[in-house]
Amino acid sequence: MSTIQLEAQSRTDMGKGASRRLRRLENKVPAVIYGGSKKPMAIHFSHNKVIKALETESIYSSVFDITVDGKVEHVILKALQRHPYKPIVLHMDLQRVSSKDILVKLVPVHFINEEQSPGIKAGGIVQHTMTQVEIRCQAKDLPEFIEVDMSKVGMDDVVHLSDLKLPKGVQLTVDVADGSHDAPVVSIHAAKVSSTELEETPEVPASAVPTTDQGESAE
């Protein structure tokens, strides 16, 4: 579970007009929380605190706590609506979860120890084919990210989905057993030489090479 904690207040004013007033006059983010055995609830957050929380990567893929009128709820972020060009959050959807709920989430992939990779030391270029993977697990087992250790990845090596070391209780949503869905995650290949670098240096004609005048010696 993420260490993120946000405080919210319930609201009774509904509709687009009420949401606009919250955003413009009170600098609040309207939101809704739903799921579990409780009824959906309209709430709002401090916009500044939401912006700060969104700087933390784990809020997009982890279970975190919100406090609504003094009561703690365990939630995941289901949807986030942003202004098309202003740094403003327009609305948030949050889903209540319990520890045993089965979740399907996209989580980020972190590549560690790249500086120790034999392939990189040999001048290879890293190609990150995936930066996140979809997993299935109970809420209590939901990781903030999946690590890929690059310390032993050599030149022309490819790390596939089947090579990922998943935490206990976590599964990929795709079946990689038969290989047809075993997509590459990261690879290292030799740097490509551009065509201009491959062009041969043009030959210099003999007539362009200066010669030394050794004239006849006087007797």
From Swiss-Prot:
Ranges annotated as spanning the membrane: none
Q: CDD domains, per this entry?
A: Ribosomal_L25_TL5_CTC (cd00495)
Which Gene Ontology MF annotations are present? 5S rRNA binding; structural constituent of ribosome
Q: Name one GO biological process term.
A: translation
Write out the entry's keywords from A to Z.
Answer: Ribonucleoprotein, Ribosomal protein, RNA-binding, rRNA-binding
* Composition-biased stretches (Polar residues): 209-219
Q: Where is this region: Disordered?
A: 194-219
What Gene Ontology terms describe where this protein resides (cellular component)? Answer: cytosolic large ribosomal subunit
Show the InterPro entries listed in the entry: Rbsml_bL25/Gln-tRNA_synth_N, Ribosomal_bL25/Gln-tRNA_synth, Ribosomal_bL25_b-dom, Ribosomal_bL25_C, Ribosomal_bL25_long, Ribosomal_L25_dom, Ribosomal_uL5_bac-type
Q: Name one Pfam family in it.
A: Ribosomal_TL5_C
Q: Which Gene3D superfamilies match?
A: Ribosomal protein L25, beta domain, Ribosomal Protein L25, Chain P
Q: What does this protein do?
A: This is one of the proteins that binds to the 5S RNA in the ribosome where it forms part of the central protuberance.
Family assignment? Belongs to the bacterial ribosomal protein bL25 family. CTC subfamily.
Q: How does it assemble?
A: Part of the 50S ribosomal subunit; part of the 5S rRNA/L5/L18/L25 subcomplex. Contacts the 5S rRNA. Binds to the 5S rRNA independently of L5 and L18.
Protein's name according to its UniProt entry: Large ribosomal subunit protein bL25
The organism encoding this protein is Legionella pneumophila subsp. pneumophila (strain Philadelphia 1 / ATCC 33152 / DSM 7513)
